[in-house]
């Protein structure tokens, strides 16, 4: 029974997240249905990062086992044919050892959060950015972000319904940059860790936004982290601005 590794891109807007649910459309359900339609088999996918409703991905990784030894290009093309017109694309498929697990073999996950920082409304990217119309200082946001790096208790940036056994996480990267293209300006938050708590990236993005408009200092952000003062955090940034951009394996 060969194991296939899939690299997947999707627009999260029409889905209730990755994980299969009883009545709502999800990315996992869409792909598993496509698998059944092309192969006649019932397969269960395991992914590297179970994204929430509205969160996008440009390099999600998942694995599944099939009874038949299909050509990898056939798997890719057949799945894409059965996924249309849903905004999900299988970028590649490859056979991997049975020991490979898309979730548990991962050593690092990468996310990007996009903030459109202008007053004029977004026409083309509104489903993929958080629009903040007041001025933000990306340098102040970056300075505050550096206070969150390292191994810490991230309880202040954790969803109430988070099921992780421990709030301890090691944040390896949290960079904030401003990207300009004419009148189009975005603030991009790039972050990496082995794993994240539920809502951690969005909670950090909302808090860094307050640092960008000088409502919180870098010291304030460090104190929020140290004390777990969730009530002092910024708003939970909307899901639409978040994209899963990659995963590393040994």
From Swiss-Prot:
Domain of life: Bacteria
Molecular-function annotations in GO: RNA binding; tRNA pseudouridine(38-40) synthase activity
Keyword tRNA processing: yes
Known catalytic reactions: uridine(38/39/40) in tRNA = pseudouridine(38/39/40) in tRNA
Residues noted as binding substrate in the record, renumbered to the chain: 111
Active site: 52
Biological role: Formation of pseudouridine at positions 38, 39 and 40 in the anticodon stem and loop of transfer RNAs.
HAMAP family: TruA
UniProt record similarity statement: Belongs to the tRNA pseudouridine synthase TruA family.
UniProt-recorded name of the protein: tRNA pseudouridine synthase A
Species of provenance: Methylorubrum extorquens (strain CM4 / NCIMB 13688) (Methylobacterium extorquens)
């Amino acid at each position: 029974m060969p194991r296939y590794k899939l690299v997947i891109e999707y627009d999260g807007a029409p889905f209730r997240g990755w994980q299969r649910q009883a009545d709502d459309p999800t990315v996992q359900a869409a792909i598993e249905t496509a698998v059944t339609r092309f192969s006649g088999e019932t397969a269960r996918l395991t992914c590297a990062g179970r994204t929430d409703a509205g969160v996008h991905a440009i390099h999600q990784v998942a694995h599944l086992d099939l009874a038949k030894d299909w050509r990898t290009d056939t798997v890719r093309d057949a799945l894409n044919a059965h996924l249309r017109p849903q905004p999900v694309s299988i970028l590649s498929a490859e056979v991997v050892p049975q020991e490979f697990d898309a979730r548990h073999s991962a050593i690092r996950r990468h996310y990007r959060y996009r903030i459109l920082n202008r007053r004029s409304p977004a026409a083309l990217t509104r489903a993929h950015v958080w629009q903040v119309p007041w001025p933000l200082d990306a340098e102040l946001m970056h300075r505050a972000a550096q206070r969150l790096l390292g191994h810490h208790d991230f309880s202040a940036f954790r969803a109430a319904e988070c099921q992780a056994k421990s709030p301890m996480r090691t944040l390896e990267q949290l960079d904030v940059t401003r990207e300009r293209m004419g009148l189009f300006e975005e603030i991009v938050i790039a972050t990496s860790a082995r794993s994240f708590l539920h809502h951690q990236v969005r909670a950090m993005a909302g808090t860094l936004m307050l640092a960008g408009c000088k409502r919180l200092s870098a010291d304030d952000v460090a104190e929020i982290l140290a004390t777990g003062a969730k009530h002092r955090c910024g708003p939970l940034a909307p899901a639409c601005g978040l994209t899963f951009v990659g995963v590393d394996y040994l």
